[in-house]
């Protein structure tokens, strides 16, 4: 009683998605607690599905924090705030995991002040054109995530982290990747906010290149 039953024609997709979800959260449970990552407390199989228990934190999202601010952050402020997130992403990468959903909505600023990354998702959930309804974050999702024919990698998280930093120092969400592929109208951070040093602006631009091979490859 209470077991989740997929539609007959979706049974294979359901089983595959369930396995992918369990594998991901088992790995996250083994990895956390870790600096900059929201902790997975337990993973359970019941009712023909899988449940993951994630630590609940009091605080606000980075998105909400930026909305409340009256000015943009300086590059130094942005780096300080994102430092634990970068450490967490580096931990994911060393463990063979890729987040694929880094954005202001998935960065939590707890009351204790140490930012944590949440919003974990499977590959299929973070890939356009997959059999699942994808959950991508325009402006932060890398171009390769919009096609099932392209491969995401550590460089995908590099793009998203740079996009988040761009938002923090300019106050503007980056142009979404599909639009950039048609006409790349992404303005440099320095041109939008004169207080952003040219070198810092160039680092962000490099990390947000449309071609994954031309970006930094990891954090």
Placement of each model-derived feature along the sequence:
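Activation-segment/catalytic-loop signature of the eukaryotic protein kinase fold
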Residues: 42-43
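Conserved short submotifs of the Hanks-type protein kinase catalytic core
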Residues: 47-61
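AlphaC helix of the protein kinase catalytic domain
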Residues: 62-73
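Protein kinase catalytic-loop region centered on the HRD/HxD motif
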Residues: 85-97
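C-terminal lobe helix-coil module of Hanks-type protein kinase domains
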Residues: 139-219
